Amino acid sequence: MQSLNDNIYPIFNQIISKREKENRLKQNAKCIWLTGLSGSGKTTLALKLEKTLFEQGFLVQILDGDNIRTGISNNLDFSENDRLENIRRIAEVSKLFVNCGIITINCFVSPSNKIRSQAKKIIGDENFIGIYINADLSTCEK
């Protein structure tokens, strides 16, 4: 019996390069990964950043944890393994956007170094900008 991997033929080396796409879009694609407690303002900040960059002529995509949980990760819970899988999935999606030359703003709680390191490894160190949103607990509880 053939394994599934026997029928997979990646074409990464044949597609138009990230650099060519960035040149076409006149921008330098990165993944801006906003992390912090739930309610810390990640999404609010992402929306403002998206609007500012878009008004300056940049192509931007927000990937928000709540939106992702209603779609490609709707079968996952909040166990440690499912949190890792959620971040793995979104990091792979982010990598696709970045490789298309699109600035990607991600809003995810990402509570552990293990989770953030996994995302950074998938997306690529050179394409990953991690930002911790430091908000006190009383702000997050509102």
Feature names for model-found ranges:
Residues 42:
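Conserved lysine of the Walker
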